[in-house]
UniProtKB/Swiss-Prot annotation:
NCBIfam families per UniProt: PRK01143.1
Protein name: Large ribosomal subunit protein uL11
Any one GO molecular-function label of the UniProt entry: structural constituent of ribosome
Organism ancestry: Archaea, Methanobacteriati, Methanobacteriota, Stenosarchaea group, Methanomicrobia
Gene that produces this protein: rpl11
Sorted UniProt keywords: Ribonucleoprotein, Ribosomal protein, RNA-binding, rRNA-binding
Domain of life: Archaea
Length: 157
């Protein structure tokens, strides 16, 4: 029977320590080789937490599945901030151009409940509310209202 281990690791910086080592060690596989493979596959997400699923079958074959980081991590990376605002409704810590919102929406589209780019972009803008990041200089709520009013229909088509 195959064993599955799901962990959240720092992109490009996974180690054989917790949470990976203790979970993979008892499975009798080369933990260092798996960690090196994870680091190669997550290098582009450097500094972000990345969900990784490691599946080990009965013959000790390892299959890695690397997910996409949480939307908050992508928003903060694009905005160039380390930490979200402690008071997101009153104090903004960064600003995203619409292009960055669209890029994140396209990345996350598969795992979102949205059927089109416009609603996916509004979901990303909703995340901006909780992090304290503005969109095109507007609060995320104002940006969502602008999308609803059709202000950015051309870019979101």
């Amino acid at each position: 029977m195959a064993e599955t281990v799901e962990v959240l690791v720092p992109g490009g910086r996974a180690t054989a320590g917790p949470p990976l080592g203790p979970a993979l060690g008892p499975l009798g596989i080369n933990v260092k080789a798996v960690v090196d493979d994870i680091n190669k596959k997550t290098a582009e997400f450097n500094g972000m937490s990345v969900p990784v699923t490691v599946m080990v079958d009965d013959k000790k074959n390892v299959t890695l599945t690397v997910g996409i980081p949480p939307t908050t991590a992508l928003v903060m990376k694009e905005a160039g901030v380390e930490k979200g605002s402690g008071t997101p409704n009153t104090q903004a810590v960064g600003n995203l151009p619409l292009e960055a919102v669209i890029r994140i929406a396209k990345m996350k589209m598969e795992s979102m409940l949205s059927y089109d780019l416009k609603t996916a972009a509004k979901e990303v803008m909703g995340t901006c509310v909780s992090v304290g990041v503005t969109v095109e200089g507007k609060t995320a709520k104002q940006a969502i209202a602008a999308v609803n009013a059709g202000e950015w229909d051309e870019q979101l088509a």
